[in-house]
Every structure is written in C-alpha cells, then in structure tokens.
UniProtKB/Swiss-Prot annotation:
One GO MF term attached to the UniProt entry: phosphopyruvate hydratase activity
Record's subunit section: Component of the RNA degradosome, a multiprotein complex involved in RNA processing and mRNA degradation.
Record protein name field: Enolase
One Pfam family recorded for the sequence: Enolase_C
Cofactor(s) needed for function: Mg(2+)
Lineage of origin: Bacteria, Pseudomonadati, Pseudomonadota, Gammaproteobacteria, Legionellales
Keyword terms of this UniProt record: Cytoplasm, Glycolysis, Lyase, Magnesium, Metal-binding, Secreted
A GO-annotated cellular component: cell surface
Localization per Swiss-Prot or TrEMBL: Cytoplasm; Secreted; Cell surface
Domain of life (superkingdom): Bacteria
Keyword Nucleotide-binding: no
The family this protein is said to belong to: Belongs to the enolase family.
Single Gene Ontology BP annotation: glycolytic process
C-alpha cells in the first residue's frame, strides 16, 4: 500500500548565527518521517527567492520565522495531506502555485524549502534508502566531491578589514575524500599556528575560517600558501586556492570599492587575472557583481579556459537566469544553494541544466547553517563533484564533512574522489 502524507509540522530552531530558522517534519501513513532544517545567507543575491521573516522587533530583533512556521502548519499542510511523497515535482508545484508569486514571497522560500526537503527525506526513509541513493538512483553515477574549504573569512562573513569574503583551499590532489579532509585539517592547524605566532587574531568567522586583519587581500593568499607548505603539501599540486570575491557587496555606482580604490570592471578583471598568474588559483566565485553582466562577459572571455568562474549571486540557482547566462557565455560554473530557489525540484533542474551545458556544479551551504546535512547527500546524488561547506571547525560545517565520510565508506569504490576531474573549465 502506498504511503501518503498524514502530517506536516514546522517549528522555530536556531541557526549557527543565533537567528531563528525552520525545522520541518513530514510524517507518512507508514509512520516513516523526514526532517529538514533551512539555512540562511548573509550576502544574498537580489534575485533570490524570499526568506520570510516576521519583522517583529520585540522577538529576535525582527528575525523570527513564526509566520513561515504558520504557513507550513496551515495552508501548506492542508494542501499536501494525502499526497504521495514520491511525487516530489507535483508536491513542489502545488506549493509554488499556492504561493502565487515569482519569488515565493507569500509563503516564504524558507517555509516551502523546509517542506520540500522533509518530503524527500520521508520518501527516502520509507524506501529504506539514504537520501543520496533515493535522489541519485541505486546505480548512480556517484562521485565524492572536492571540498572548497573556506579557511580565511572576510567581507560580510567577518568583522575584519578584508574585502573579499572567502579565501579557500581546494585539496585537488588527494586520492580520496577522507584524505582531502585530512589535507584541509592539517593546513587549517598550520594556518592557526602561523596566525598565533604573528600575534594575529585566530577567532573564526561565520563559516569557521579565521578572520585576521591583514595588510591587504593578497596577504591572505600568502599566509595560506605558507600554511600549505608548513603542512608539507605542494601548492598547485596537492592543494589549490579558490576565492569568493562576493563582488556584488563591493559594487556601487558602476565601480568596485576595493582596497580603498574605486575600480572599473576592467580594472577588477585585471586584478583577478594578475592573481591567477601569481598564485595557484583554480576557482573564482562572484568575481564581478550580479548586476555587471557586461563585465562578466569580459571576465569570462579573459579567463574561462584558465580558471573556474563560478556564478553565485548572478545565477541564484535559478534555471531561467542560468539559461540566459549560458546563452551569453557568462561564467563556466554555478554555485547551487537550495534556499536561493526554494524547492528541491527547481534545484535539481538547475543542476541538470548546468551539467548538460558542461558548466561546473558546486553544491553549497549558507553562512547561517544548522546541523542539517542535506547538501552532502545532494552533492553525491547529483554527481556534482564539488562542495562548498565552510572551514574545518564549527559543528554546523563539520557535520557535512562527517556525513560525506559516512557516504564514502558506504559507497567505497562506487564513488571515486573527483579530484581534478571536477574542474571542467578547460574541457568545455
């Protein structure tokens, strides 16, 4: 007998920044159930689906999500009772139509996403399958993703003087995911030791990376290279560098406010190009603003065959916007964040569109996270080959890494570590 949805319940929990978010539980007639918690971003794209907040300044500084909880426990629950949880596309369609807006502003993308993911977990649990097998099929193909590890935080993720948001290490040369994690952890500790020895702050930012004040952004690269060598790895062979410039945060009146200079798009591109020549940079995310499409075209023409150019704010995990970018030859990879678009179905459509056009895919966390590990399963299920889930500390980040270790043990030879094959920029 087919199991159907018999109950949906949401409540407020806290995320990693002490802000409220939703956790949703979907229960089936078989007594199987699924739970999911929703993340939240700090630097958000203008075209992201809308996260519903209460704006009641007497609770959580206006950041409460009681209205979103009410939307789940009321109209969404009423609309989905009796549905087959395996009908993910239909369930997501019902919620989108019930919302009635292009950006999910009525019910809230946080409400809709929580239900969408909890439904998938309930269906997977009812089938006695882990989420990655339920979504990816029993035979895959599966691979273990290369982690992009954010070990120095700046921009909107920290309170230091660095303009760029994330300076990452990418352990491309590791033979397995478990070894990649070890590479990263050892560099993390080597970096901390260097910071302490220089009297620099070793406190961490939102995503678990260190947040020191440094003379300039290049100094972050230099520090990381020293830490890689201290840990006995070879930069540009064992471990590469990656950067999230989060340039939309720097863009005002057609210029980039960078290191106390007002740079044009061309000058920003020159700076990024210079760094790709000077350092072993394999990936640049949001090198230009989401509203600087002309600049993005120039950046892509300049660097598309040399480094991975990741669109985050410019694409916001939206298949329609990604399709426009593909036609205009903008970027060569996309960052995929579930809560930017608000349903599992639309997320999978975006991943499929990217892969069919040979765009790299990076499954990503948000700066406000929970212990939810959905993105780990999603990265394996979709054979995305890359994941971005923060640094090597803070349980909200490490939970995803530990889940990937579990999956690697379960799949063993069925899921080889993607390594350099994860990067498609030189094979388009």
């Amino acid at each position: 007998m087919t199991a159907t949805i018999t109950d949906i319940n949401a409540h407020e929990i806290l995320d990693s920044r002490a802000n409220p978010t939703l956790e949703v539980r979907v229960t089936l007639s078989s007594q199987a159930y699924g739970c999911a918690a929703v993340p939240s971003g700090a630097s958000t794209g203008e075209r992201e689906a809308v996260e519903l907040r209460d704006n009641n300044l007497e609770r959580y500084g206006g950041k409460g999500v009681l209205q979103a909880v009410e939307n789940v426990n009321g109209p969404i629950r009423d609309a989905l009772l009796g549905q087959d949880p395996r009908s993910q596309e239909e369930i997501d369609r019902i919620m989108i139509e019930l919302d009635g807006t292009e950006n999910k502003a009525n019910l809230g993308a946080n409400a809709i996403l929580g239900v969408s993911l909890a439904v998938a977990y309930a269906a997977a649990n009812n089938a006695d399958l882990p989420l990655y097998r339920y979504l990816g099929g029993d035979g895959g193909p599966f691979s273990m993703p290369v982690p992009m590890m954010n070990i120095i935080n700046g921009g909107a993720h920290a309170t230091n003087n660095l303009d760029f948001q994330e300076f990452m290490i990418v352990p491309v040369g590791a033979p397995t995911f478990a070894e990649a994690l070890r590479y990263g952890a050892e560099v993390f500790h080597a970096l901390k030791k260097r910071l302490v020895s220089r009297g620099l702050m070793s406190a961490v930012g939102d995503e678990g990376g260190f947040a020191p004040d440094l003379p300039n952004n290049e100094a972050a690269f230099e520090l990381i290279l020293e830490a890689i060598e201290d840990a006995n790895y070879v930069p540009g062979k064992d471990i590469y560098l990656a950067l999230d410039a989060a340039s939309s945060e720097l863009y005002q009146n057609g210029r980039y406010d960078f290191e106390n200079n007002q740079l044009t798009s061309e000058e920003m591109i020159d700076r990024l190009t210079e760094w790709t020549k000077k350092y072993p940079v394999i990936s640049i995310e949001d090198g230009l603003s989401e509203n600087d499409w002309a600049g993005w075209k120039l950046l892509t023409e300049r660097l598309e065959n040399k480094v991975q150019l990741v669109g985050d704010d410019i694409f916001v995990t939206n298949p329609d916007i990604l399709e426009k970018g593909i036609k205009k030859n903008i970027a060569n990879a996309i960052l995929v964040k579930l809560n930017q678009i608000g349903t599992l179905t639309e997320t999978l459509a975006t991943v499929g569109l990217a892969k069919s056009n040979k765009y790299g895919v990076i499954i990503s966390h948000r700066s406000g996270e929970t212990e939810d590990t959905t993105i780990a399963d999603l990265a394996v299920a979709t054979d995305a080959r890359q994941i971005k889930t923060g640094s090597l500390c803070r349980s909200d980040r490490v939970a995803k890494y530990n889940r990937l270790l579990q999956i690697e043990r379960e799949l063993n030879d069925q899921a080889p570590y993607a390594g350099k094959e994860a990067f498609l920029f030189n094979r388009k």
